[in-house]
Amino acid sequence: MAASPIKPAARIFNFGAGPATMPVEVLEKAKWELVNWHEAGMSVMEMSHRGREFVAIAAQAEADLRKLASIPAGYKVLFLQGGATLQFSAVPMNLLRGHDVIDFVNTGEWSKKAIAEAKKFAQVNVAASSEDRNFTYVPRQSTWKRSRDAAYLHICSNETIGGVEFHWTPDTGDTPLVADMSSHILSRPVDVA
């Protein structure tokens, strides 16, 4: 493998939300495998999604995720494009199932975006909000004013813009809990069952 084009003293470390610093060794391996994945003679980006090599990559990714997140066998793992923003519309389109109301806990900018998108599909009940103190806390669950028949309760479990994070999993009883965990997924154990 060739020497890294970045000298260690010149390397910039990003500790911001979102993209993060990666070890140079990982980047170097990715660089080489991008061009020729495991000596297959082509890049992963050039492979057929039905081809043997790519099917093996997808199966290994699912197995790894199941192991890391302790996902039970009875659950499906979906690898979807679009990120959290697309899910703001995909979730209500798929989970309303005849319900008219969605409950939200509004803890910041990402919650507000999810609420705005959900309003296109259903009535939105903001069960709790920390807007009164500029989104600097998570409201205690005992203060939430939930709907009786909500399709689900939505939280953004880590508001990266304001720096507010749920350090607990809300008990929603029989109401499904939807958590936007896109900024901290796999950062701690989560009971997905």
Predicted regions and their residues:
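PLP-dependent aminotransferase-like
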Residues: 85-153
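Active-site phosphate-binding strand-loop segment of PLP-dependent enzymes
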Residues: 18, 118, 129-185
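Conserved active-site segment immediately N-terminal to the catalytic lysine
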Residues: 178, 192-193
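A glycine-/small-polar-enriched, mobile loop at the entrance of the PLP active site in fold-type I
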Residues: 11-62
